[in-house]
């Protein structure tokens, strides 16, 4: 079992990163938000889940225990494998995902690629009472649908408007753009749109 990994990023790929630790390169599949922050040559730490199948051995990495806990909860639901669990964590911040689960927001959950209505309903039903208390508290404002994620910069507003025009849901769009701005407050609208599209599709 590999529960934690610390090393130097060698390469960032689509959906994963190669991390060198102890002279060995590990391919770590990560949420999109984490991948966007990884840079070759820099040190990185991951809370990990190692999954062994008949045809593959997969290592999933997360920035903290909260992401890992939510990943484990998601994949405990019938019909939700690790790839889909990762897709859900890539589509929005943990707090927004927790809000959707707590509030039974089937529309939000089913807006993620690969999540059908029945799966979204099952996620909401089975996990609404299992989300850790501190995540529930962080998401309590959003769970009522009254306070969308705050986007303060002009570039952020422009990015939100452009993404809404493409048909994405407002809660998802605002959450994605707000998280990107948190990582890079000076990001341009074009950069925000490009990176947000990678998460929302």
UniProtKB/Swiss-Prot annotation:
Flexible linker: annotated segments: 143-150
What's the main place this protein lives? cytoplasm
Q: Which GO terms describe its biological process?
A: DNA recombination; DNA repair
Q: Which GO terms describe its cellular component?
A: cytoplasm; Holliday junction helicase complex; Holliday junction resolvase complex
| Claim: Chloroplast is one of the keywords in the record | no
**The organism's place on the tree of life at top rank:** Bacteria
Extract the ranges annotated as region (Domain I): 1-63
* Chain segments carrying region Domain III: 151-201
Give the CDD domains listed for this entry: H3TH_StructSpec-5'-nucleases, UBA_RuvA_C
Assembly and partners are described as: Homotetramer. Forms an RuvA(8)-RuvB(12)-Holliday junction (HJ) complex. HJ DNA is sandwiched between 2 RuvA tetramers; dsDNA enters through RuvA and exits via RuvB. An RuvB hexamer assembles on each DNA strand where it exits the tetramer. Each RuvB hexamer is contacted by two RuvA subunits (via domain III) on 2 adjacent RuvB subunits; this complex drives branch migration. In the full resolvosome a probable DNA-RuvA(4)-RuvB(12)-RuvC(2) complex forms which resolves the HJ.
- HAMAP family given in the database record: DNA_HJ_migration_RuvA
**What is the protein name given in its UniProt record?**
Holliday junction branch migration complex subunit RuvA
Record organism: Deinococcus radiodurans (strain ATCC 13939 / DSM 20539 / JCM 16871 / CCUG 27074 / LMG 4051 / NBRC 15346 / NCIMB 9279 / VKM B-1422 / R1)
Q: What is the lineage of its organism?
A: Bacteria, Thermotogati, Deinococcota, Deinococci, Deinococcales
